[in-house]
């Protein structure tokens, strides 16, 4: 599928799997997508914004109050521009913030303002993922219309074995493609059928 004319917003949070999102950004660009990346401050400890800027050709946003850009209300303009948002790897911290409407950084303000489909791919230690609080937060996001991409199982960065791995890049891209190609809801649209 060609993603020409589509904007994919990647929200990268502070998990060890953050580096994998560089391959996702690169693959989406090859499919013709306009890729924007927002990183949390914690994500910058795992991969630098420069990597995403080089791959996408856009400034990678981290700081909500960054003044090194043309004047616009950046979090709103990015929210309006996006055809789909993918937050991956989604940490327990960012999942909790999104589930409760906490918008205290660039990523969470954009997600809160975005009206496009939103995908969340949790990636964390099994104990954190299976914690009832995290599970409640994921259900809350689903209730609000987010699509939660199931984590994969395997050996985690902490050497535990279990669920919590970020899915492979092609799985994440397939979710994006499916979401963009999904037929739009026609609720509230008047259609005249004539014979």
Q: Could you tell me what each predicted segment is?
A:
Residues 1-119, 125-195:
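A cross-family phosphate/adenosyl-ligand binding-site feature
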